[in-house]
Amino acid sequence: MSIISTRLNSIKPSPTLAVVKKTLELKKAGVNIIALGAGEPDFDTPDNIKEVAITSIKDGFTKYTNVDGIPLLKQAIKNKFKRENNIDYELDEIIVSTGGKQVIYNLFMASLDKGDEVIIPVPYWVSYPDMVALSTGTPVFVNCGIENNFKLSVEALEHSITDKTKWLIINSPSNPTGAGYNCKELENIAKTLRKYPNVNIMSDDIYEHITFDDFKFYTLAQIAPDLKERIFTVNGVSKAYSMTGWRIGYGAGSKALIKAMTIIQSQSTSNPCSISQMAAIEALNGTQDYIKSNALNFQKKRDLALSILEEVTYFECYKPEGAFYLFVKCDKIFGTKTKSGRIIANSNNFSEYLLEEAKVAVVPGIAFGLDGYFRISYATSMQELEEACIRIKHACNAL
C-alpha cells in the first residue's frame, strides 16, 4: 500500500513555481538567465508598511489572533470595499487568510461536494483547477483564446452551465493574460447569471490596482448588488503593495460561507501571521500614492515588451488592460526545427528552446490550460526586460 494518497493523482505541482526553481538552479550554476516567470512585483514593500510590522514585533504582537483575522484588519478591509468598490460588508462577512490562495482553497473546501462543477475560463491561473479537484469538485473548462480577447462570452457561459454548476470563476485583470472585464461585459454576465440562481461566482480581484490606460476596474458585486449573496470576492495585499511574502489575502461573502471557511481554516493554519496582519492594516489604511505610480511603471514595461515582441512574425500579442503579464500566441512557430534538429511541437518545447537558446525563462501556455502560447512577467527592470525580449526575438529569428 502506497503512503501517498490517491488524491495526488488528480493534481500536479505548480508549473510556474517549477519554472522559478529551474531558473534558480541555472543561475546558481552560473548561467546568465533572465527570469520572466515569477508572478510578483519587482519593487519592495513600502517603508511605512515595514515600519508598522517592526513596531508590532517590538510591541510583542506575536501571539495567536482570531482565526479569521483581527477585527482591526477586518474593519480596514470593510472600509476598503466601501471606499473603492462601494460595497457594504459586515465584519462577519469577511475572512483573512494566509494569502489569497488559502482564501480560495478554503472557499472550495467549504462549498464543494463530489461532482459539483466549477466553470473555469481558459487560460486560467494554474491553481484553480487543482484546488477544485482537491475539494472533490469537477473543473469545467471554457476556451477563451486571443480571438475572444481572453474573456468569457455570455454565450459560452450559458452553454457551460448545467444543473451541477456551483461556481463560476472570474479573474479580472487576469493571470496569465492581463485581460480585464469592463463594466458592460460584467453587466452582461450578471444578466445571464440572474437566470441561474444556483450558480455562485468567485471574483478574483487580486490585480485590481494594476490597470492601464483608460481601463476602469469594476468588481461584479459592485455591478450587480442584487447578486451579492451569490458572489464571493477574493483580494489581498500581495500585488498592489508588493507583499507576496507577507501572505495576507482576504475574502468577502455570505455569513454562512465565511463561517464555514473559518471552520476549515481553524483546522489547517489557524490565524494568519499576526505581524503581517498589522502590516496589512497599514497597507489598506495608509498612503496609496505609490499605487498609481507603480501601475504607470508597469504600463511602461508592458509597452516596451510589446514593442519588441510584436516584431516577431511568429507571434500574436494581446495588449493587456492590467496585471503584469503578456500571454503571447506562438503556435505559428510549431513545426519548426532548431539548430540541433529538435522539432518545436508545443509550448513546452518552445519554452525549453528559449531557456536553452535565449537564456530566458518563460512559462509555457499549457501550464495555464492553453497550448500555443507562452507567458512572460514584465515585473522586472526595464533594462532586463528589454534585453530578455531582444533575446527572445533573436532566438525566434534564428529558426
From Swiss-Prot:
GO biological process: amino acid metabolic process; biosynthetic process
Parts of the chain that traverse the membrane: none
Binding-site list for L-aspartate: 39, 125, 175, 375
Cofactor(s) needed for function: pyridoxal 5'-phosphate
GO terms, molecular function: glutamate-prephenate aminotransferase activity; L-aspartate:2-oxoglutarate aminotransferase activity; pyridoxal phosphate binding
A Gene Ontology cellular-component term: cytoplasm
InterPro entries: Aminotransferase_I/II_large (IPR004839), AspAT/PAT-like (IPR050596), NHTrfase_class1_PyrdxlP-BS (IPR004838), PyrdxlP-dep_Trfase (IPR015424), PyrdxlP-dep_Trfase_major (IPR015421), PyrdxlP-dep_Trfase_small (IPR015422)
Keyword Methyltransferase listed: no
Modified residues (N6-(pyridoxal phosphate)lysine): 239
UniProt catalytic activity: L-aspartate + 2-oxoglutarate = oxaloacetate + L-glutamate; L-arogenate + 2-oxoglutarate = prephenate + L-glutamate
Main location: cytoplasm
Keyword Transferase: yes
Keyword terms, alphabetized: Aminotransferase, Cytoplasm, Pyridoxal phosphate, Transferase
Family per similarity comment: Belongs to the class-I pyridoxal-phosphate-dependent aminotransferase family.
PANTHER family from the UniProt entry: ASPARTATE AMINOTRANSFERASE (PTHR46383:SF1)
Subunit-level organization: Homodimer.
Entry protein name: Probable aspartate/prephenate aminotransferase
Taxonomic source organism: Rickettsia prowazekii (strain Madrid E)
